[in-house]
Amino acid sequence: SRMSDPKMIKEIIDAVSIPVMAKVRIGHVVEAQILQAIGIDYIDESEVLTPADDLFHINKKEFNVPFVCGARNLGEALRRIGEGACMIRTKGEAGTGNVIEAVRHMRTIQSQIRKLKVMPKEELMIAAKELGAPYDLVEYVRENGKLPVINFAAGGIATPADAALMMQLGCDGVFVGSGIFKSENPAKRAKAIVEAVKNYNNPLKIAEVSEGLGEAMTGLEIDKLDVTFAER
């Protein structure tokens, strides 16, 4: 799959008052140039689309539009940030309604951050080499205990409880697409997920907003998928 029709993207931009994000294929510089030219607010260099380049991601520093990129671990996150990404998200399996991959990626990144925080400074160069990440970004994570950009959860989030779980695991926010639009009552579910993110440490509130939402999207087993996006 490829970038959406620019005409449709422009129609969406004209129809809504909120920022609009659109996907480009990994490594496809021209798709990103097109989106910037038509006035998109954010670009997602996304593994959900068929990659255009299996070696290189886009040099995001050459663009004025902010990019979001996926990451399964700290090394991937810091490499994308080194290329200019302004936001990181998990590479959960989009369209599955199964949150397990997003959970795995967030736990992995948080665990690796905790290890860096207690690492002697003289070991950071080795850690940077093992992570395949820029030394200055590794040093930042050690000193601050977090990524230098915000880290969202994405992929497989289908319920208010899923969203609250990801917030409790340490993410800064969540992306939800098919989990809302493939559910029985998209508008009500969207509002409930927003409330769950705002009140992620309040089980009673999450229980309240989870009532009467109708059927959630059908969940899929990750190990039965022919293709997993996270591997891209």
UniProtKB/Swiss-Prot annotation:
Active-site residues (renumbered): K23
SUPFAM superfamilies: Ribulose-phoshate binding barrel
MF-aspect GO terms: pyridoxal 5'-phosphate synthase (glutamine hydrolysing) activity
Residues given in the record as D-glyceraldehyde 3-phosphate binding sites: R107
Keywords noted in UniProt: Lyase, Pyridoxal phosphate, Schiff base
One Gene Ontology biological process: pyridoxine biosynthetic process
Broad enzyme group: lyase
Tree of life domain: Bacteria
Biological or metabolic pathway of the protein: Cofactor biosynthesis; pyridoxal 5'-phosphate biosynthesis
Catalytic activity, reaction form: aldehydo-D-ribose 5-phosphate + D-glyceraldehyde 3-phosphate + L-glutamine = pyridoxal 5'-phosphate + L-glutamate + phosphate + 3 H2O + H(+)
UniProt keyword GTP-binding, yes or no: no
Pfam families associated with the record: SOR_SNZ
Tagged with keyword Phosphoprotein: no
Annotated InterPro entries: Aldolase_TIM, PdxS/SNZ, PdxS/SNZ_N, RibuloseP-bd_barrel
EC number: 4.3.3.6
UniProt-annotated binding residues for D-ribose 5-phosphate: G95, G156, G177, S178
Family: Belongs to the PdxS/SNZ family.
The protein's assembly and partners: In the presence of PdxT, forms a dodecamer of heterodimers.
Function, as annotated: Catalyzes the formation of pyridoxal 5'-phosphate from ribose 5-phosphate (RBP), glyceraldehyde 3-phosphate (G3P) and ammonia. The ammonia is provided by the PdxT subunit. Can also use ribulose 5-phosphate and dihydroxyacetone phosphate as substrates, resulting from enzyme-catalyzed isomerization of RBP and G3P, respectively.
Protein name, per record: Pyridoxal 5'-phosphate synthase subunit PdxS
Source organism of this protein record: Clostridium novyi
